[in-house]
Amino acid sequence: MDRKISIAATALKAAAVFMLTAIIFVAIIFSLPTPEGFPILEYHQVTNEAVDLDFERYNVPPDEFAAQLDYLQANGYTTITLQDFMRAVHGKGSLPPKPIVLTFDDGYKDNYTTMLPILEAHKMTAVVYVITNELGKKNYMTHDELKDMQRRGIEIGSHTADHLPLTSLTTDEQLYQITASKRFLEWSGLATIYSLSYPNGEVTTEAIEFLRQENYLTAVTGDAGLNTLETNPYKLYRVNIRKPRFGLTEFKFRLFKAEFFAKLRNIF
């Protein structure tokens, strides 16, 4: 009995030490100055009804999305595209004081029917990444909708041909996914495609080399953080915006998450 009590006491002490260490560590992170850089937000659907229950957690209802844009405007953020970012990288332009990039993965039809009108009402822009082999299918945009979206100032990017994690593919398969999607979009009448979103945010060294070969200029990951003009343009940080359970409070937390991980990288 005494041995069990001793083991329990030791476990409690270890847990207390761990909690205290964690609290001190987080306090140190909070005390650090805000790092330079801008966030890239990762959205998927903007609708009252997600494609299916599996995707519900990635859906932001229209009223919540509008409230998030209101918050960004009220706090001085200006949306930019990743082409704007690269122009600044090459000294051909400058970024506004508080830039932010809104990205939308997959190419859902509600991006055109619901998201775009809300975005335009706020005089904002975005980058939309499409899975080319899904275009025209149920719940996805058509070619004409995609072209109209680009004509209205939205940057269009590739989310590969089939949305297969590149880390699970052979070198030749990665090359196909990266090149086929870009060429298909450009051959179908869209302006040059310069950006790619890695499926599931997973990056490979081979993919980065293929992106360079195919004249992509940027690519976004699933890793949270902030981006600067010195950030590797093929490994840009993004923070995922999920269906909010706590309204703007959760959205603010997501913005802070990008800052928090940027602070961590500055330490390590």
Give the ranges of each region predicted by the language model.
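C-terminal active-site subregion of NodB/CE4 polysaccharide deacetylases
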Residues: D2-K13, F18-L102, Y108-D110, S168-F268
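Residue-level marker for buried hydrophobic side chains located in beta-strands
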Residues: L102-T103, I156
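A short alpha/beta connector and helix-capping loop motif
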Residues: Y112-T132
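Acidic (Asp/Glu)-rich catalytic clusters
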Residues: L116-K123, M141-S158
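Short beta-strand and adjacent tight-turn residues that come in two discontinuous sequence segments
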Residues: Y129, H159, A219-T221
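Short histidine/acidic/glycine/proline-rich micro-motifs that form metal-
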Residues: T132-G136, P165, P199-E202
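Charged helix-capping and loop-helix junction motifs
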Residues: N139-L146, E173-Q177
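Substrate-binding clefts and substrate-entry loops adjacent to catalytic sites
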Residues: G157-D172
